[in-house]
């Protein structure tokens, strides 16, 4: 079966190239890094000069001037990006490289949490983080510490995968959640032990894998350990023939609080002047179809209410502004004005990495992707004690949604009319105590679930 997949991956190469080209044309690929899709990367190893300057590592190189000089001269400056890239050290010095694959934005935040906590225990370890989407790449490039580097995952073909693995030679691979690339996983397991963490299977994928159970088992046998995020997912894995998976809960419960620039927060808070801020976060066009028609009504009822919209894909900003105009709403993007135009109906945040800043000033946050896409990360807003609202489709975050609802830490709505009713109720001064309770419960929920991270680390560190 795997040989058949390998053969198909060659037959389908022209289609892969066309897909990459289309993604490039619509702005979903970075032309400056397109070579990484073919395992041609400027970063050949993740160690940097600080690794060589480390006292412990100076000791390792002591008395071996030739290798020390080679290590130093292998570090070069990439003038186009300003990043430091490096040729591989000898295998004996490249033994502490962890490769983490995070498909998209949510998984990337979990990767950052793992890196932060593993590096505290093992300061000599370095990290390679791969992802597939441009949005996750931008976040990771901005947030990764010096001990880590990001690269796009190459096309799932044996030629590119083997070249990628030869370049990096990781010593442990960690795949987060549900993106299973057969060739990458099969070849990766030949290089090092692989772990699948925070694993989940959507209902749709589960039905598809049931028809290809033997192939699913063939892919999953490459993992030395599989940790799922819920009892429901554990049951699905068991039904698919994976009997040794364990459930430790959702690592997204342990995501670290999003960073906030305190100077910018001070300016923003002062500018908003105690207005009640409602944030619509990680929105898709399907969400905006529901949200935009109710905003005029909401603002007419609550003059001190201000709306901030943060699209999942900021490159859609022009179409969102046009859509606002069609609903007779005025809107300004952050790229046009660094602070909200208070006379406008909506402020659109079209920059990455600023979600924490706007959650900091929000009273209520609606989590996008929850009408048709299965929902996005609820917990990021919970860390900022926001009253959280989400739509009817949380199929990708079922257990988190169930948990917050059971703890009265969030509200689920059915449609636009229901959303307007809930927002009107919560923003009414008569219901301020109930609003306060939802906000407090959201923060308590994430604080009480921090133990999940410790349990994950106990398992992961056994493979270091």
UniProtKB/Swiss-Prot annotation:
Pfam families: Glycos_transf_N. It is found in: Cell inner membrane. The record marks 177, 252 as: Transition state stabilizer. It comes from Rickettsia felis (strain ATCC VR-1525 / URRWXCal2) (Rickettsia azadi). Its EC number is 2.4.99.12. The active site is at residue 107. Belongs to the glycosyltransferase group 1 family. InterPro entries: Glycos_transf_N, Glycos_transf_N_sf, Kdotransferase, RPE1. This is 3-deoxy-D-manno-octulosonic acid transferase. It is a single-pass membrane protein. The chain crosses the membrane at residues 2-22. Keywords: Cell inner membrane, Cell membrane, Lipopolysaccharide biosynthesis, Membrane, Signal-anchor, Transferase, Transmembrane, Transmembrane helix. One of its GO terms (molecular function) is Kdo transferase activity. It is an enzyme of class 2 (transferase). Residues 47-93 form the RPE1 insert domain. GO terms for biological process: lipid A biosynthetic process; lipopolysaccharide core region biosynthetic process. Involved in lipopolysaccharide (LPS) biosynthesis. Catalyzes the transfer of 3-deoxy-D-manno-octulosonate (Kdo) residue(s) from CMP-Kdo to lipid IV(A), the tetraacyldisaccharide-1,4'-bisphosphate precursor of lipid A.
């Amino acid at each position: 079966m795997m040989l058949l997949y390998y053969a198909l991956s060659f037959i389908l190469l022209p289609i892969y190239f066309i897909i990459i080209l289309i993604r490039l044309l619509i702005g979903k690929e970075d032309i400056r890094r397109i070579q990484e899709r073919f395992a041609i990367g400027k970063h050949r190893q993740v160690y940097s000069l600080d690794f060589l300057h480390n006292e412990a590592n100076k000791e390792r190189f002591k008395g071996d001037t030739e290798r020390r000089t080679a290590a130093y001269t292998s570090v070069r400056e990439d003038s186009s990006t300003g990043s430091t890239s490096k040729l591989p050290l000898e295998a004996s010095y490249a033994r502490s490289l962890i490769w983490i694959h995070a498909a998209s934005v949510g998984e990337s935040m979990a990767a950052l949490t793992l890196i932060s906590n593993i590096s505290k225990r093992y300061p000599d370890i370095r990290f390679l983080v791969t992802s597939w989407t441009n949005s996750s790449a931008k976040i990771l490039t901005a947030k990764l510490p010096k001990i880590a580097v990001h690269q796009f995952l190459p096309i799932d073909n044996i030629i590119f995968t083997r070249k990628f693995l030869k370049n990096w030679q990781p010593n442990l691979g960690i795949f987060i959640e549900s993106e299973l690339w057969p060739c990458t996983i099969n070849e990766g397991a030949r290089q090092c032990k692989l772990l699948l963490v925070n694993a989940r299977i959507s209902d749709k994928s589960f039905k598809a894998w049931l028809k290809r159970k033997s192939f699913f088992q063939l892919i999953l046998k490459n993992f030395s350990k599989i940790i799922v995020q819920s009892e429901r997912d554990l049951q699905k894995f068991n039904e698919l023939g994976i009997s040794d998976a364990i459930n430790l809960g959702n690592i997204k419960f342990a995501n670290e609080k999003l960073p906030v620039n305190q100077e910018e927060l001070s300016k923003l808070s002062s500018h908003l002047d105690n207005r009640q801020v409602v944030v619509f976060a990680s929105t898709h066009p399907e969400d905006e179809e529901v949200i935009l028609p109710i905003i005029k009504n909401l603002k007419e009822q609550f003059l001190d209410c201000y709306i901030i919209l943060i699209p999942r894909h900021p490159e859609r900003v022009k179409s969102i502004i046009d859509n606002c105009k069609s609903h007779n709403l005025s809107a300004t993007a952050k790229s046009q004005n660094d602070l909200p135009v208070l006379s406008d109906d909506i402020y659109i945040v079209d920059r990455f990495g600023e979600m924490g800043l706007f959650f900091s000033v929000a009273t209520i946050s609606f989590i996008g992707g929850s009408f048709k896409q299965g929902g996005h990360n609820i917990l990021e807003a919970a860390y900022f004690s926001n009253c959280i609202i989400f739509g009817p489709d949380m199929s990708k975050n079922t257990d988190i949604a169930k948990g917050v609802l059971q703890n009265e830490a969030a509200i689920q709505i059915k449609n636009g009319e229901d959303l307007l009713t809930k927002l009107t109720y919560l923003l009414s001064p008569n219901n301020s105590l109930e609003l306060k309770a939802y906000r407090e419960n959201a923060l308590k929920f994430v604080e009480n679930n921090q133990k999940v991270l410790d349990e994950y680390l106990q398992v992961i560190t056994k493979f270091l």
